Regions:
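Metal-dependent phosphohydrolase cores
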Residues: 1-142
């Protein structure tokens, strides 16, 4: 599952302004899974999403797909640290439920993202994020 050199160049041209932002670079400081940083995880998600769209001719908006995929975990905290909340509130403060909202707030704070890109970010953990359902093909792909 690899993009061609031309496809990679096209993808990186879309992501360049985001990738160069200091806040995006902060994602390199946080571990996502195992020894994979949040930054590398987001990059992997974008590469796979872009590949799926191209190989299956899904016709997704590639800019929205790339931006939403790249920023989907732009939450900027160590999710392994435990919360101080208890009971039902703690359940909904758990990372799996709450991080898409945090990532979307950050993405809107530092970039002008579209409604479609917001939906990609907010719904990427659906059905855990039951209030944020994927409403576009790009969100389903991510």
């Amino acid at each position: 599952m690899q993009l061609s050199q031309i496809e990679r160049e096209q993808l990186y041209a879309i992501l360049e302004k985001y990738d160069q932002h200091p806040k995006v670079q902060e994602m390199r400081e946080f571990i996502q899974h195992g020894d994979v940083t949040t930054y590398q995880h987001c990059k992997n998600v974008v590469l796979v999403s872009f590949w799926i769209n191209r190989r299956f001719h899904l016709g997704a908006d590639e800019t929205a797909l790339a931006v939403g995929g790249f920023l989907h975990d732009f939450y900027l905290y160590d999710w392994h640290k435990t919360s101080s909340f208890h009971g039902l509130r703690r359940l909904f403060e758990l990372h799996g439920f709450s991080h898409p909202g945090s990532a979307c707030v950050n993405a809107k704070r530092y970039f002008q993202i579209t409604k479609k890109e917001q939906n990609i970010i907010q719904s990427h953990m659906w059905p855990l994020t039951f209030r944020h359902v994927p409403t576009c093909r790009e969100a389903v792909i991510v």
